[in-house]
């Protein structure tokens, strides 16, 4: 946060409580205002960094409140080690600004809250820009372990709703990252209307995904003009971020759908062990890792010249909500499970032999396959391998989910698949290749979406600024 901001909270594990840690209640709270917002232009920027509309969103779209004092702008410095916590989160911080958005090659955190939004009818281009500025300002604070504004959860007027909901007070940053994306319908809506003058700026590659084998998509779990991916090592920190960003957007966007995730199903760094999905197998062994800079340049980041220019340094995100038929899978023999996946369940080694990271051999036979390759040609490993997909690789960043149970008492559980790629065709190619996957018998795709992920915000700028400049 800008060093000139008044009432600035201190950095560290206890930063969320910040300027309300000591002193009497009277000393901590500004004097009540008669109504400083109602008589001012709602489009005018708030002095604390949030626009007046952003503050009105926090206050319930019309209630009076206290604007936080201080300078705008939100240059961020990377920092780590903010102290101990009684919660699962850590003091690790990742900067909000940078060449790329955080939350892509960042080491995958343990928890996710993902949300998709539609822009409300009647919202103008200027209001959309203002929303992105508000979201960027608030996110730049949240990733430091701060409240969404300087007055925060308990430092504002006692006669107005707090700016911040407060459930993350006292918690460290917990490696929080907040990543934003723009869907095809932001540029041209479902009726073909260019609401924000962005049609000419839409990436040619940003179109609705084709229908795939196994799709049973529900519209209420798919699409969205905008998306926000909040990842953290503490679930309360991730939920707090989405909750408060949704409040800031009140009156300008509507929450379309959201998904909670736990237990990452991929590693994005060589320092991380390969996790397991709900089928019990190691997942994402061959994932693109952050340390593979040549691979991220080739497969993840949109390069200058790929088009459009405003997206250079960004990526494309595909989300798929995949329900796993848990009860059916649990009755499958271990040997058959391994044949379906193409890997050993204990160590994750390919059935052709070796260890987890041994390159699969799709020709070698085994003593039990009677002249056939050890790895079935229709196994998941075989069909998803780059060798079978013209070299296409994805940076996967998915999570497990359990959303209760259905009317038959079966777990509504599965994989919330997230992949980042330089070109959506990479995902399409792999997904079409998986049409004969033996695993499909146990999967149902119920949600889907695609978004362009703009490059990172510059210091003092906002996410998406290159799109509107």
Regions found by a protein language model. Give the residues of each.
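N-terminal secretory signal peptides
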Residues: 1-50
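Long, histidine/aromatic-enriched segments associated with O2/redox biology
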Residues: 49, 54-469
């Amino acid at each position: 946060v800008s060093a000139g901001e008044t009432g600035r909270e201190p950095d560290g594990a206890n930063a969320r409580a910040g300027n309300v840690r000591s002193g009497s209640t009277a000393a901590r709270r500004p004097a009540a205002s008669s109504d400083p917002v109602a008589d001012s232009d709602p489009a005018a920027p708030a002095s604390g960094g949030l626009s007046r509309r952003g503050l009105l969103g926090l206050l319930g779209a019309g209630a009076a409140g206290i604007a936080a004092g201080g300078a705008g702008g939100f240059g961020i410095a990377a920092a780590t080690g903010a102290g101990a916590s009684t919660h699962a989160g850590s003091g690790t911080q990742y900067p909000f600004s940078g060449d790329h958005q955080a939350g892509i090659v960042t080491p995958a955190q343990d928890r996710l809250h993902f949300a998709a939004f539609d822009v409300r009818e009647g919202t103008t281009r200027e209001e959309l820009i203002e929303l992105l500025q508000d979201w960027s300002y608030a996110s730049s604070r949240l990733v430091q372990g701060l409240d969404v504004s300087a007055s925060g959860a308990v430092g504002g007027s006692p006669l107005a709703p707090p700016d911040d909901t407060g459930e993350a007070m006292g918690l460290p940053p917990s490696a929080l990252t907040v990543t934003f994306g723009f869907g095809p319908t932001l540029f041209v809506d479902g009726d073909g209307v260019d609401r924000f003058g962005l049609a000419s700026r839409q990436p040619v590659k940003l179109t609705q995904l084709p229908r795939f084998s196994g799709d049973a998509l529900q519209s209420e779990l798919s699409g969205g003009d905008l998306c926000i991916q909040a990842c953290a090592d503490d679930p309360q920190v991730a939920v707090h971020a989405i909750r408060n960003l949704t409040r800031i957007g009140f009156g300008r966007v509507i929450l379309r759908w959201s998904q909670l995730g736990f237990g990452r199903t991929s590693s994005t760094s060589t320092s991380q062990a390969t996790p397991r999905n709900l089928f019990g197998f190691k997942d994402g062994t061959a994932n693109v890792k952050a340390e593979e800079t040549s691979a991220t340049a080739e497969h993840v980041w949109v390069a200058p010249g790929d088009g459009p220019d405003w997206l250079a340094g960004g990526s494309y995100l595909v989300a798929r909500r995949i329900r796993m038929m848990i009860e059916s899978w649990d009755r499958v023999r271990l040997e058959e499970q391994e044949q379906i996946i193409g890997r050993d369940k204990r160590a994750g080694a390919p059935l052709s032999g070796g260890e987890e990271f041994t390159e699969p051999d799709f020709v070698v036979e085994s003593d039990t396959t009677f002249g056939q390759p050890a790895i079935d040609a229709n196994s998941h490993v075989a069909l998803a391998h780059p060798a079978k997909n013209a070299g296409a690789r994805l940076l996967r960043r998915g999570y497990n989910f359990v959303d209760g149970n259905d009317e038959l008492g079966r777990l509504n559980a599965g994989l919330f698949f997230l992949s980042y790629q330089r070109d959506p065709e990479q995902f399409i190619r792999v997904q079409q290749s998986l049409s004969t996957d033996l695993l499909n018998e146990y999967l149902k795709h119920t949600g889907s979406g695609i978004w362009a992920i703009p490059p990172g915000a510059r210091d003092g700028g906002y996410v998406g600024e290159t799109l509107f400049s």
